[in-house]
Amino acid sequence: MDPLASQHQHNHLEDNNQTLTHNNPQSDSTTDSSTSSAQRKRKGKGGPDNSKFRYRGVRQRSWGKWVAEIREPRKRTRKWLGTFATAEDAARAYDRAAVYLYGSRAQLNLTPSSPSSVSSSSSSVSAASSPSTSSSSTQTLRPLLPRPAAATVGGGANFGPYGIPFNNNIFLNGGTSMLCPSYGFFPQQQQQQNQMVQMGQFQHQQYQNLHSNTNNNKISDIELTDVPVTNSTSFHHEVALGQEQGGSGCNNNSSMEDLNSLAGSVGSSLSITHPPPLVDPVCSMGLDPGYMVGDGSSTIWPFGGEEEYSHNWGSIWDFIDPILGEFY
């Protein structure tokens, strides 16, 4: 064989190898471009976080939203459930639809919520503790209303001889709220008021003595006739009459001091064995019996007489015009 021909053939093979090596970078670039295009196509099918969550029936769109769908039983169709902001919301929607369609055979993405077990345990704990709390509450309850006061002997220890309570007695406290309104009394009524205070203190002292001796079984030492009896209707009429007439002695401090001194002197001078003589309350006050309204009083209005009444009303007809008489 000719050595020149063999050498020429060897050079030709080397040239072919060089051309192949020069063509290899192009093939590598084509493979790289094909792989990158395939990756782009894969990314377009789902969102970037689609591989992180593996929930049944849940997938992510390329723009980031999550969608949920469920396959209906015994069918190949899927039921659309909606678009959600997070994967957990889409998974919950799938679980609700699965329970509705499959019942107890549903395969859920999320386990049953633990708050239900927590609530059941808390309810059991509360049920266990409720008897103790109810017993403690019944033990701590107290009556809202006060207990009634014990009844006293005779049933009249809280009231005076004329139904006036001792704890609010205007005669003993020296108050003038009932006898004297905002305008007060005239001096004459002030004197009458002093006499009424004296009489009320005397009656109260007699009643207390009577009640104390009744409790000690010594009622024989006191005569019931020592307590002067006045008409309650006349008493209230006197009070109302004093309020209507009015005066300027309600706020007089000196008159109040006189009342207090008079009350002390009368209270110290009175005793059980030597009661003072009976005094007519109406005459001692200087009041006209015509002003009193009671069982034995027949006159109410203080007129001078029937002649004055008839004369005053009879004079009305003297002023009637005789011309008007024709129309009657």
UniProtKB/Swiss-Prot annotation:
It holds the Pfam family AP2. Residues 54-111 bind DNA. Keywords: Abscisic acid signaling pathway, DNA-binding, Ethylene signaling pathway, Nucleus, Plant defense, Repressor, Stress response, Transcription, Transcription regulation. Residues 1-56, 111-141 are annotated as: Disordered. InterPro entries: AP2/ERF_dom, AP2/ERF_dom_sf, DNA-bd_dom_sf. In seeds, mostly in embryo, and seedlings, especially in vascular tissues. Confined to the hypocotyl, cotyledons, the root cap, and the root quiescent center. GO terms for molecular function: DNA binding; DNA-binding transcription factor activity; sequence-specific DNA binding; transcription cis-regulatory region binding. One of its GO terms (biological process) is defense response. Induction: Only in young seedlings by ABA, imbibition, glucose, 2-deoxy-glucose (2DG), trehalose, and osmotic stress. Its main location: nucleus. SMART domains: AP2. Residues 16-26 have a biased composition (Polar residues). Interacts with SPK1, SCAR2 and SCAR3. Binds to MED18 to regulate abscisic acid responses; recruits MED18 to ABI5 promoter in the presence of abscisic acid (ABA). Transcription regulator that probably binds to the GCC-box pathogenesis-related promoter element. Also binds to the S-box (5'-CACTTCCA-3') photosynthesis-associated nuclear genes-related (PhANGs-related) promoter element, and thus acts as a transcription inhibitor. Involved in the regulation of gene expression by stress factors and by components of stress signal transduction pathways. May have a function in the deetiolation process. This is Ethylene-responsive transcription factor ABI4. The gene is ABI4.
